[in-house]
Amino acid sequence: MARSDEDTWDLASSVGATATMVAAARAVASRGPDTLIDDPYADALVRAVGVEYFVKLLDGEITLEADNAAMLAVMTDVMAVRTRFFDDFFLSSGLPQAVILASGLDARTYRLPWPSGSVVYEIDQPEVIEFKTRTLADLGASPAAELRTVAIDLRDDWPRALRDRGFDPTAPTAWIAEGLLIYLPPDAQDRLFDNITALSAPGSRLATEFHPDAGARIGASSQRMAEEWRRHGLDLDMADLFYDGERNPVVDYLRERGWEVEARSRPDMFAHYGRPFPTGEAVEALRQSLAVTATRR
């Protein structure tokens, strides 16, 4: 189903299901002796959501055609590298105030070694926030920093809701927008960064990712995966969840608004973490992605 301005979701449908998919990839990527990440909560969160395909994937009960199996392996590596990039961003920022935008099933507030006195704000739709908070509590997990949830759609007045939860715009803040931009209309992407800029004191830091030509390239590969998923009973076409339209390049947009920006290609990120980047036409869309970090002047 195509997106609309008023659409909503839980963790088993629409954009929410992609959060569960990412958590499943994190769970798989956390296994084995040579892992880049350690997410001890991802497996349990995916099982709690209960999407049969993702549970079977965790249990090794899904047999994919060769091309799609290879793509799944690539995507697992992509999620491992991406997760590690954002983990390292928070760990290196040294800032006691952090915001996770569209937090989904992200468990960083629970699993990272936050400095004493850290406050982490997680923003997502109310049903998503409630589910993750309750499930992790049922697992006996406790946040490693002070957690303040902000249950609101990012298309609404989230800056006000964030301040109402105690956010201090005069304090430098570490922000992440992971796996988010492609699900926003181009104008909403600009508003997101405008709001972040308005809320960021000098010294604030931001990490995100940008996919040039995202809709066309990634949409085509997503449709191939959607056909395979339907064979296994999962009705999810990620191409329907993306917003088309020309976007302002994130690097230029942030620089014009007072940020010092660095960007690294996905192959460079793979090399940085000691992983070979795959070759072939199927991964060309992934090759174009940029890992972006910025510091507010």
Curated annotation (Swiss-Prot):
UniProt enzyme class: transferase
TM ranges: none
Keywords for the protein's UniProt record, in alphabetical order: Methyltransferase, S-adenosyl-L-methionine, Transferase
InterPro entries: Ppm1/Ppm2/Tcmp, SAM-dependent_MTases_sf, SAM_mthyl_Trfase_ML2640-like
EC number: 2.1.1.-
Residues involved in S-adenosyl-L-methionine binding: D124, D153, L154
Keyword Oxidoreductase on entry: no
Superkingdom of source: Bacteria
SUPFAM superfamilies noted in UniProt: S-adenosyl-L-methionine-dependent methyltransferases
One Pfam family in the UniProt entry: LCM
MF term (GO), any: methyltransferase activity
GO biological process: methylation
Alphabetical list of NCBIfam families matching this protein: mthyl_TIGR00027
Family label: Belongs to the UPF0677 family.
Function recorded in the entry: Exhibits S-adenosyl-L-methionine-dependent methyltransferase activity.
Stated name of the protein: Putative S-adenosyl-L-methionine-dependent methyltransferase Mkms_1060
Organism: Mycobacterium sp. (strain KMS)
